[in-house]
Amino acid sequence: TVMMWDDHDIFDGWGSYPQELLDCDVYQNIFKTAKKYFEIFQIRSLKNQTLLTKDRTHFSFALKFRNYHILGLDNRTQRSIYQVMGNDQWKDLNTYLDENILNDNLLVLSAVPVVYRDFSLTENLVDFTSWQEELTDDLKDHWRAKEHQGERMRLIMRLFMNIEKRKVSKRNTRTVILSGDVHVGSLGVINDHKNQNKIHQVV
């Protein structure tokens, strides 16, 4: 099995609450404990050869299985209201895409769907209510939350760039995002009409 954690491995909505809450001693101790046991039982120690880095700043991993590259994105360790992945994780991700995925298919694991409904109007309304924090984790967890939309586009464009690179091999390859979290099954497609490329998503 290959595993990646999400908020429920820590507590519901981790990373999508105000920073002063996330930084308090109670929350930080919960996070450190969850991180310790995630390393032991899911990552199975930092000796795991698939990790993109061994410095514990994030747990994104990559491996090859038959004609698929499997790239697991860590969307929790560095998450805040303002980012999904930190700069060092982006650097490791870009390096792996540039140096390793030159042909074959790509399966990207993203705990929260990249292709999903736009809740920005609802999010704007909730921001002005007294129960903002109770609903924050459900709305701000999404890639399409207003604070994450730029990073979402960065991920999509980066995947399309990799598709163009793989075209050089003259092989018919696919890029598929495998996701979950939203309690509903779905299929989605992101189209690049200019270059006739597609990214499929399965939830």
Q: Regions from the language model: what does each represent?
A:
Residues 1-203:
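Metal-dependent phosphoester/phosphodiester hydrolase catalytic core
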